[in-house]
Amino acid sequence: MSRRLMLTQIRPSKPTSDIDRYEKKNIYSTFRPCAKHRLGNAVSYDLPRLVAQKGVENVYDAIGALPGITVQNGVYMLGGRTIAVAINGKTQNVAYDQLQELLRAMPASGIERVEIIHNPAARMQANAPLIALTFKRGDAESAPFTAEVGGDMSLRHRTLFGERVSGTYRKGPFSLDLSYMHTHGRVLDALRTDIPEVLSPSGGPITNTQERLAATSKHSYRLAATYTLGERHTLTATYQGFNTNNDLSVSNTDSHFGSAAGKVKAWLHNARIDYSMPFGVRLGVEAAFYRAPERHVLLDYVSPFSLYPDYNPWLPTLSRQDFLVTDSLRTDLWRAYIAGEHELNNGWTINYGAWFKKVKHNSVHHQRRHVLGYNVEWNYPEEHFTTAYVGVSKRFGEKLSAEMSVSADYYHRIIITQWRVLPTFSISYTPCDGNVLSLVVSGSRGYPHYSDMNGIPQPDNGGYLYTLRTMSLMPSLHYQAQLSYATKGGFQFRAWYNRASGHVMQQLYPDGFLRCVILSNKNVDRHQQVGLQAVMPHQFGSWLYTCLTLGGAWTRDKYEPTLWEVPVNSRIIHGEAKFTGVATLCSKPNIALSVDAFGQTKTQQGVWELPAHAQLDMSLRWMFCKDMATLRLFCNDVLANGTPKYRYMVYDKGFDLRNVPRRHVGVSLTMRLGGTR
């Protein structure tokens, strides 16, 4: 069964002529990121150069190459918080796992500029650090048509293939962008679980290795059309989505053994229309429809020799528990917004707006067990989000600027109704050309993922491990303060303090009646973090680029449990380091070697300990045919040690969960077409 483990909107302001001149003056021939002074505490990066040298194919992997970005539980994090993404000024509102699929279908070569806003203002309509992507639009001198085709093959104990195509057409006021990706093959994952006797429902230790083989076929696509009416009227229509089909085969070994077969499908349709008017008003509507039906048949044979140590070995019998599980999940999203921004006299700017979102879920869960019979559960909650905001910004000469905004957030679910007022204040000072000192204080909301609260338990590990969903999860409230300094050469130094109430984390407790261990998502009473980070890029001539990111944080989690649950009052200091290096081995032919390394000391998430781990990725890139073709060889997780282990300590015994690490090797080829008139 699928299982989620500890899961834990920007309008592009038109730059002034001074900033335009400043940007042109600071376009380096290297990959060195340049900090540029922008309202909203944004730092702009010349990412396309680094993407070209590393040979990165898609937008999702390009975001991972940004300084300061780390990965936690398969999710991109920035300053200890999950990121949000905006594409051409439009924040993406689909869930993170759905957004991940869409970004993988978009070509990285289309990126023109990337901005990072660590604490976005209310006008940016984001509750997390924002990665604002701007894609190339072309001009009168550009070619009317460009295209890119590519394919890749990767091996991680099974072979996975991918084909992709993207194209851009521009003529006069009209532009059209298309991207499509098809992925197919087999994926093998292995999950190892060690349950000590103090937590075991049988009184003895349980060790289980679960191998999951998926035959997958996935289609991802995006179509965006923009038409400029008159001088400054702009109409944009975007359609994006994916369709995936997985046939699963699962086997359990060690303490108990058995098998499972399943079929998992999912498809997403997301459409939006945005309209910009010349006097600073924008409005838009959006709809998304997501479907994810599943069907699993589990045949589980329990070995008595390890589950019941005192059982007479001369009477070997096997107890059988088989069950059929079907689940049908539907999610419908509707969203509408209106926003305005106007420049006033003496450097003042005012912005205002409001948006409304309605999300309707529907899930029906059928379960038929060999012993307990037939069971049906269903959930059909609705979520309503409403936000209204107003803000002002002011430039005090060429060196100082400030921005302040206030938003009123309303959230409603069948058992919850909440109002919150969230302020944001930022001030930036430029002591000299290219250096920026910023202070930001902000408040934001976090909302639990629907899969964490759909009220339907999901069995795993042969039925001895259950992930229990709960509808009682509440939205979390976050307050952040950050002080940062960015230099002209791209160095960044950052200190932050985060405080959250209601942060969602996963807890566990044994259930003797159900004879299983239950994993349940809970709202942590208090989550605090104080962190430091330094980003230090450097260019050595024209042949070597390096970027070293060092960070550390003090984190505290506190949770007062109810009956049978585990209390949490953890404090820990941990550090992490990330290194990126790109060496040009030869200019003719154009060959470059890329090395990415990441290391982290022991840390903790709620009741779970994460021992220290490290990961090393390497790739070799060759550009030929006048740099219109790129061949890339890569090996991810070279040391086979990049997958963290999640451990819960009971006295001197550990309950361990770990995906078995495997090296990931492959080759990709990309061809660019067009680009010349």
Language model: regions and residue ranges:
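Short acidic/polar hinge/loop motifs at secondary-structure boundaries
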Residues: 92-118
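Extracytoplasmic beta-strand/coil segments of soluble accessory domains associated
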Residues: 60-95, 123
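C-terminal beta-signal and adjacent terminal beta-strands/loops
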Residues: 622-677
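Gram-negative outer-membrane beta-barrel transporters
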Residues: 523-603
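Face-selective signature of the C-terminal outer-membrane beta-barrel domain
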Residues: 218-245, 261-436, 489-498, 528-553, ...
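Outer-membrane beta-barrel signature, preferentially recognizing the C-terminal barrel domain
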Residues: 445-495, 499-501, 518-531, 536-539, ...
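N-terminal periplasmic accessory domains that precede
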Residues: 5-13, 17, 28-32, 59-62, ...
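Short, acidic, small-residue-rich periplasmic hinge/interaction motif at the N-terminus
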Residues: 2-51, 71-73, 80-82
